[in-house]
Amino acid sequence: MTVTLPKGVFDIFPYLADAKQLWRHTSLWHSVEKAIHTVCMLYGFCEIRTPIFEKSEVFLHVGEESDVVKKEVYSFLDRKGRSMTLRPEGTAAVVRSFLEHGASHRSDNKFYYILPMFRYERQQAGRYRQHHQFGVEAIGVRHPLRDAEVLALLWDFYSRVGLQHMQIQLNFLGGSETRFRYDKVLRAYLKESMGELSALSQQRFSTNVLRILDSKEPEDQEIIRQAPPILDYVSDEDLKYFNEILDALRVLEIPYAINPRLVRGLDYYSDLVFEATTTFQEVSYALGGGGRYDGLISAFGGASLPACGFGVGLERAIQTLLAQKRIEPQFPHKLRLIPMEPDADQFCLEWSQHLRRLGIPTEVDWSHKKVKGALKAASTEQVSFVCLIGERELISQQLVIKNMSLRKEFFGTKEEVEQRLLYEIQNTPL
């Protein structure tokens, strides 16, 4: 019996020819992850890695009425009967780690992560039961320019990887007083259309009415579109804060739109919420989002600290890059040594190790295929440079290097070809 993957998960694999599966190519993930590390370093964020599973109560702080907690988590009992949950989102785990390591004494804390998340959800385009998320969490500072800086980091990531037709959509939910006032207004409005709402929205009416604005059910859309905007109910102080963020985005030339119906799917968000959207082939969809969560850290038993962050689903981002033809697999340059007879094996073993220590990626074809077959395999496997080594090369100590992409050759002693290889690898485009 052939063993296959369970539904909703996938391999990231280095050998993929099927165009529909190309988004799973290892080199694409390396490229995007490299951009993440670079842009986060430029903004002064430090990488954090939390465990794949946590005690289940960690994720209850996401909100007991959120879809993540109610129906999307993978939970299990360990051998001592304790409930554990595979990480469904990053923020709660980062806050737990932040508090457990006593970092709250620092005035400013900036973290980023690239981690797998696990949600048992209905499969849809760009979403999987194991998916990968790039996220940032900035803890300790409440300032509109900090929020703008977080948005700038998100925008710079999208720009660096080459995504096009991007826009930031924003809304401002205000604090608890604003949401209390708006809750009454929204309930009064929705009561008039209660019978027309979807079953899910009717359920949310009694648990978290604000989440109805996040509904994707078709029958809810016109009702949501005509709902009173929460921005009409925020305080003057909140509105000033929001406008300072917008002013900063204009200065930074980051395109944005105010979306008065935007709320986020996790219950801990307050004040600023945002989504990054793209439009491709006349279809608009989100590639990431986040906001402020000033009450979450105190909910964990810590001090009342301000915080802002976002998450980006990498599967959908990479699929969009491919659809927009902004990325393609890259094969790093490497040299393949091909010993043509057993007497060349020892030479290849020793020289390959020396080349690696010089910084030249090198592998040896130990299969002892015939020359034609070995060269065909090297071409098929995207090898950049090839060196055939037989009796003549061992005696003369003159080596020929074939550039497989340019179909050119250069030759010389070991020392001469080593210098030429270093130059070629550094200066030949991938």
Curated annotation (Swiss-Prot):
Location of the protein in the cell: Cytoplasm
Entry GO CC: cytoplasm
Pfam family, one: tRNA-synt_His
Listed GO biological process terms: histidyl-tRNA aminoacylation
Enzyme Commission code: 6.1.1.21
InterPro entries: aa-tRNA-synth_II, aa-tRNA-synth_II/BPL/LPL, Anticodon-bd, Anticodon-bd_dom_sf, His-tRNA-ligase, HisRS-like_core, HisRS/HisZ
Reactions listed under catalytic activity: tRNA(His) + L-histidine + ATP = L-histidyl-tRNA(His) + AMP + diphosphate + H(+)
GO terms of molecular function: ATP binding; histidine-tRNA ligase activity
Main localisation: cytoplasm
Alphabetized CDD domains for the sequence: HisRS-like_core
Keyword Chaperone found: no
Keywords associated with the record: Aminoacyl-tRNA synthetase, ATP-binding, Cytoplasm, Ligase, Nucleotide-binding, Protein biosynthesis
NCBIfam families, alphabetized: hisS
Subunit structure: Homodimer.
HAMAP family: His_tRNA_synth (MF_00127)
Family: Belongs to the class-II aminoacyl-tRNA synthetase family.
Protein name as catalogued: Histidine--tRNA ligase
Origin species: Chlamydia pneumoniae
Gene name, Swiss-Prot/TrEMBL: hisS
